Each structure stands twice: as structure tokens, then as C-alpha cells.
Amino acid sequence: MQKFRVYGQSRLRGSVNISGAKNAALPILFAAILAQEPVKLTNVPELKDIETTLKILRKLGVVVERDAEGAVHLDASKIDHFVAPYELVKTMRASIWALAPLVARFHRGQVSLPGGCSIGARPVDLHISGLERLGASIILEDGYVKAYVDHCLVGTRIVMEKVSVGATLSIMMAATLAKGKTIIENAAREPEITDTALFLNKMGAKIVGAGTDTITVEGVERLGGCEHSIVPDRIETGTFLVAAAISGGRIECKNTKADTLDAVIDKLREAGAQVDVTENSITLDMLGNRPRAVNIRTAPYPGFPTDMQAQFTLLNMVACGTSIITETIFENRFMHIPELIRMGGKAEIEGNTAICHGVDHLSGAEVMATDLRASISLVLAGCIATGETIVDRIYHIDRGYERIEEKLRGLGARIERFSAQSEES
């Protein structure tokens, strides 16, 4: 088991190149199953979840290669297997995205009920009901979601009972090869959905309205190959901006897009940060000041992203004043708070609300990561705390942040990865 050792009291300064968005790369990789010709993807981050996805695709018969420049080449023309097995799926909830393209193109598919972060219920019901509305028959059996359709999926009007990024993507992918028109209402609007739709359209799909709450898909007979660059990771961008804010530093995030982060930038400015944006960069300068507390309420895009909640919880714990954080997207997503309290933070949890009281400083401690975004908040806390912080279970971080210790060291952090076994010996 690997851990991070972080030495604190670092003021983070410099520039950092933002990686491609994991939350766009994953559905796009699975969407490549739909293509009957080769696909080339660039700006694909090197992450555990990406590695798992590529293993699943290889298991299905997709020819996968990552070249010397980091581009991923996919050839799904000879898929001969239609089951995403438990041993691969168990670590990653996003693997449910394999089902829709398999059913759409091959009229059958099986995916083991998935695993992933421990942040409450993320049921696959909306994925299943969407496929059923398109004409698929679904059986839950032996721990697998099994789907099939006699001829082809048929377009229809689907009103999402709740806004769901994952289900919107599944339905959109499936509808590309369905007969007729599919209209998805109350669709999620995240930039990653827009990027996936752009990729599908490059392959020959007919999708309009991605990025709005109504997406229309006119089914086509086949999809071909294309080249596509994954959109920059807005959550990684936001994470480094928070790192500058809590450390009184200045960080320029390069190769990113400010127009996907309006809600986050607004809150950082409210906290007292100076934020400057260009077409491809965002720079935050805290001017050596301590941030002001800001209230946060997570919401579907374009609202405040739930994936930035843990980072802003940390910001509020070292800010001037008291703040209220309300989590409306996922249950059980405050597991980082007890760990931050171990470091001297002050907060109370009441249902889906946390009340944070800013303190002058945090103190290093041994803490345990519980999910991807919680884990990065603990690492950043270690960067600014007094003393030494040990962060356990950092495999969560490797699922979603590319070369995180290298990037943090480039900004002045003192952080090292070590094996628990070597420490004990």
C-alpha cells in the first residue's frame, strides 16, 4: 500500500499544465466501441481508471495502442467478446458505459455491476431504464447487467427523472445507432457531455443540443473513425486554483478553459483571490492573503461541481469566518471532514450540510483517503499544515490525478510517495 508523505507550510507558486479530463476520456473511450474504423485520441491522461478502461476494451476485442506521444489508438472493428468481467469492472463505476455501445452496435452486452469510490449510492437504474426505453431487454443476474435487443434499438422521447451525467451519456451513445430520433429531456449539461457528443459527431453521429437540457439524436446506420483531443480537466484546474488560494500563493493553470469553471472562479473571487483568465489559461494570485469563508451549494452544471466540494471544504477550514457547505448531488460525501478535523479543522456535519469554522492553521497528522476528491483535499491540507502529514490509500488519487506529486513539487510542495512495507521494514 503506497502513501504520501507531505511536509507542510509551502506557499505554492508557478505554472502547471492541465491534463485531459478523466470524466470526458472515460465515456469517449467506451464510445469508441461504436466505431467500425480506427479512432485516435490525444490528451488522454495516464490514470488508473484509464488503464482499467483500456483493459476492458482489450477484453472485448478492441485493439488498443498508446504511442510514444501518448495518443491512444483504438480499433473496434473486430470486437468478438461482449462481456465486461467483474475482475476489471469491480474497481470502477464508469465501466457501466460499456453496456450502451455494445447493445447499440452488437445488440447484446453484459457488464458486471460496477465498483469505484465509496461516496454513497450511484445506482445504475437510470442507465438501465434509458436502454429499456430504447427497446433493450435487461436482466440483472449473477451480479451482471445483461442487455439485448432482437433487431436494433429504436429512438424515442426520454424524460430523465433526475439529472444524471452518467445516464445522459449512456442514452446518448446508445441513440446514435438507434432507428429514428431520440430526444433526451432534463439531460445533464456538463462540458464532458458536450465533448463526448463532439467526438460522436466526428464519427458520423447526428447529435444536437449537447450542453443544453434537451439533446436530440438522429440515429445513423454506422459510425466511422476520427481523431479527437480530450477537453482539459476542469476539476484538476479547480484543484490547483484552490491550492494557490489556501497557500497564499500564485498558480497559472495552462492548457485549460475558463468558460467551464464559472461557478468555481466566482467563489474563488468571493474568497478574495485575484483570478485572471485568457483563452487557454487561468491564473490565481492570493497575494499572500488568507481566504474569506464562502458558502457552497453543489448543483448540476453549470452550478457548483460536487467534485470541487472537498477542496472548498478545506479552503473554508483555513479561511476567515464561518461557512455552510450543502451537498445536493451525492450522499455520504463528507468523509474527508473527520480527517481534516484530525488536522485541527473545525466543522460539524448535519445531514447533507457541513458548517465550517475557519482556523489559523492546520497541523500535520496521519490521515486516510476515502475517495478521489477527498484524497486530494488531504494532500493539499498537508501542503499548508505545520509539520508532516501522511496520507494513506492514495490509490484513490491515482484514479483521477495524473502525476500529482510531480506537478505539486513543480509548484514548491514537498511531497514524496513511499511504500508502507518499506516504511515498516
Swiss-Prot record:
Would the keyword Metal-binding be found if you checked this record's keyword annotation? Answer: no
Task: Give the GO biological process terms.
Answer: cell division; cell wall organization; peptidoglycan biosynthetic process; regulation of cell shape; UDP-N-acetylgalactosamine biosynthetic process
Q: Does the keyword Membrane apply?
A: no
Keywords recorded for this protein, A-Z: Cell cycle, Cell division, Cell shape, Cell wall biogenesis/degradation, Cytoplasm, Peptidoglycan synthesis, Pyruvate, Transferase
Q: Where does phosphoenolpyruvate bind?
A: 22-23
**Transmembrane intervals:** none
Where in the cell does this protein reside? Answer: Cytoplasm
**Which is one Gene Ontology cellular component term of this protein?**
cytoplasm
EC number, UniProt record: 2.5.1.7
Q: Name where it mostly resides.
A: cytoplasm
Residues annotated as carrying 2-(S-cysteinyl)pyruvic acid O-phosphothioketal in the record are 117
Pathway listed: Cell wall biogenesis; peptidoglycan biosynthesis
Mind telling me what this protein is named?
Answer: UDP-N-acetylglucosamine 1-carboxyvinyltransferase
